[in-house]
Amino acid sequence: MKKQHSKISNFIQKIISEDIQNKKITHVKTRFPPEPNGYLHLGHAKSICLNFDLAQEFKGTCNLRFDDTNPKNEDTCYINSIIQDIKWLEYKWHNKIRYASLYFNKIYQYAIKLIKKGLAYVDQLSPEEIRTFRGTLTTSGIDSPYRTQSIEKNLNLFKKMKQGKMLEGTACLRAKIDMASNCITMRDPVLYRIIFSKHHQTNKKWCIYPTYDFTHCISDALEKITHSLCTLEFQDHRKLYEWILKKIDISCNTHQYEFSRLKLEYSVLSKRKLNLLVNNKVVNGWDDPRMPTLSGLRNRGYTPSSIKLFCKKIGITKQENTIQLSFLESCIRSDLNPIAPRYMAVIHPIKIQICNLSDNYEEILNIPNHPTKPNMGCHKSIFSNTLYIDQNDFYENKSELLKKLAIGKEIRLRYSYVIKAHKIKKDQNNNIKTIFCTYDKNTLGKNPKNRKILGVIHWISEKNVLPARFFLYDKLFTIQSPETVKNFLQYINTNSLVIKYGFVEKDILTNISTTAYQFEREGYFCINKNFSITKNLTFNRIVTLKDKIK
């Protein structure tokens, strides 16, 4: 088997490469095993990209398997969302979608096998007592009084559990390993528990369900996964993973390897904390564009290739580190910059009146859709006597240092003429209503002689405007590491969404199917498809520009 790339970029690639060279394996098989109890986020994207890309690189296969072992928290809506997200990332899993529940009969038989070998027992301690008996990092655990039950009694009790003759929480099946182990995971972990809930795949066939730890390794073995990849919090579970596979005598060549989980600035990636954001109505659902979920990022305007570029660039290591938000933003900029057509949008409009032009004057200007790609063509704009510029581009007190329009100062309108401000008109609240200017007709595409013009600003003609709403998104938290604080909801950025009403060029309607636009000097935007394009045209700001020309 030949690799597609000779360059080794992470330790897992190196392990796989060595396994192939040493003929430990002949075919690489990975898997992405989400629990269908929530929506995928950026942390999951890291795992998705790792597993699918490794399989592709080494010409192997990657399975999609739902680890559906807890019907209380699972739902088909999560399954559908996960499938949609993986398809959106443009990955294809091997053959059909798999479910751990398809293996429940086999897993049950393996549990019986452990009981018969004296390696599992039915414990009737309460969940609270089990936690207490397990001990701590500094104290050994205590044997359950049910640990020494006969094999026959354990088989009978486990059968009663399966038949629904025991109440939820009154009994569980535990592995008999070592209550004095330094690894708490190995202190007689629970293998099966009673759950009287309808399962989305098996309906009411089962009332006992295997735990994640018991199911996961067996599912990997049954699917002949060669490299089972998970995050570092499962490092201590590897001993149990290997113990189970060894004790049930299953033929397999699968091994678990761990890598660091993703941590991102100004974000939380804990499913519990994301759930709190939704339930406390901090955000408008799991697909809110401020959320780090894949559905949220998709609604924000992030592209599959930008997410995959991000996951590739952050790399795979065992070292825990927090990724800067700017790193993610640079990936979407890199992706959109070559393809996004340029338009002008005025988000904070203020009126400009050109005094030396008549009311009926119109001049058609051809504006390039991309500054470096002539093949992307042009669109038409109108220059007239009434324009709109951004409020932030006018400074009432003249300053030669600021590249802004001011009374007595000149500035260039992008792709157009140089204008000079002479006076302003204010409303009753002392807000500037109109700026009266003149234009220099000899400055189209060239600078005036003997005059230095500082600054270029964007604009739109009143005869070429399309009213629009702009959703300006920002960081959801005011602190860099909200994951590390107890009361993280106290640090919500109340300005994470600011709504503005302004204008965009009419010609944008001819490019309505475009993935994203660059609004010059403002950032990258996409159309918010939750609102009518004809009645309530709304744009989401995906990301600001790295360097604004102000």
Curated annotation (Swiss-Prot):
It comes from Buchnera aphidicola subsp. Baizongia pistaciae (strain Bp). This is Glutamine--tRNA ligase. Monomer. It is found in: Cytoplasm. It comes from the Bacteria. Its EC number is 6.1.1.18. One of its GO terms (molecular function) is glutamine-tRNA ligase activity. The lineage of its organism: Bacteria, Pseudomonadati, Pseudomonadota, Gammaproteobacteria, Enterobacterales. A motif ('KMSKS' region) lies at residues 268-272. PROSITE patterns: AA_TRNA_LIGASE_I. It catalyses: tRNA(Gln) + L-glutamine + ATP = L-glutaminyl-tRNA(Gln) + AMP + diphosphate. Its main location: cytoplasm. InterPro entries: aa-tRNA-synth_I_CS, Gln-tRNA-synth, Gln/Glu-tRNA_Ligase, Gln_tRNA_ligase_bac, Glu/Gln-tRNA-synth, Glu/Gln-tRNA-synth_Ib_cat-dom, Glu/Gln-tRNA-synth_Ib_codon-bd, Rbsml_bL25/Gln-tRNA_synth_N. The keyword GTP-binding does not apply.
